[in-house]
């Protein structure tokens, strides 16, 4: 009698199913929970405006930060992140899992970014700094200065000096226009305060003229203690009808022709900004003045000085007479030149 075929035990199928489930679970755990070492720390994930979850997942997968972009998209959509993902800069350190990334994006709190605007910069340098900042959305990069000012509601005015130098914190993904607006509004507030607190009988007719003076002071010295004295020299010269004769104004008027050195011919070459050939203040500011320069222009030192010369250590020597000034020039400039 032939033997009957043996039946497979019914208990084998649950085991196979359990093994399959455990295998999938282990794979999902590896994909979702097990961290990946980052290529650099901190790793910066920048998400621009209107970027989709799929685009973010693809970018992360291409860089090897996540192991499976489709799983990230499924999990993200299950949390509704395809509708509420927030633009910005997200920083991660050491190692990170897909789950860590999803939770950060779901929280929607990107790290802050910063833009530092230096005292004494000109408007061209400000634009370059904003254009180079990778955390800013660049709407105005290809606009002319006039187009940019028009978007800010400013017409028939030069941009120089209108933006306050400071460090601005912002949410990554912010528009460059927002940064320009903040810097302009801050300068207006600072200028109004300086104008309201100014000494009486200064030779400024408008806050804008005070701003021009502050920009000249800013370019002449970076030493806080000297700024009120420099402002006093300029105010005294204006009151006496003397020309300001400040080299930074000549350099500004030279534009791109300035290559690091200024000659006697440059001092004689007339431009609207040459305070050796023109009376009074320059037609516009020549830099972005900071708080100390604004305060110095509004409250110059009580001094009769009409001249100053750089001493070579960052400070200046101030003189009331031309004879004293010439002696200081011989001491600090000519003597130094002969020793070099």
How would you name each of these model-derived features?
Residues 2-42:
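N-terminal type II signal-anchor transmembrane helix
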